[in-house]
Amino acid sequence: MAIFRTKKENNFVIMSNYHLRDKNLSFKAKGLLSYMLSLPDDWNYSISGLICNAKENKTSIKSALNELIRYGYLNIKKLYPNQTESKKIEYIYDIYELPHPLEEDMENLELDNMP
């Protein structure tokens, strides 16, 4: 068997491969996390934004995000209108290359209730 690699001069990302070896994660969750880690650090994450760049539908994306939450790779914090400049509900995504335990004082959202 041969693996044909390209020379990495541009359009590549360096990330930990820990999540790729994590047997708790499905390939769907591994792929989504890899995609999210490949985006710029200041990217404005949203379910609708992820759907726009994927073949998967909303249910599939939410399923993968819930899996990442369950295993500590993602935390989503809901900000209420009185906490934001836009005066609208906003969501803050904290994405981890390595699993991160949920802090007791942080509320981790269940994505079934998100728009």
Q: Where are the regions a protein language model picked out?
A:
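N-terminal leader segment of winged-helix/HTH proteins
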Residues: 1-10
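Short, Lys/Arg-enriched N-terminal segment that forms or immediately precedes the first helix
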Residues: 9-23
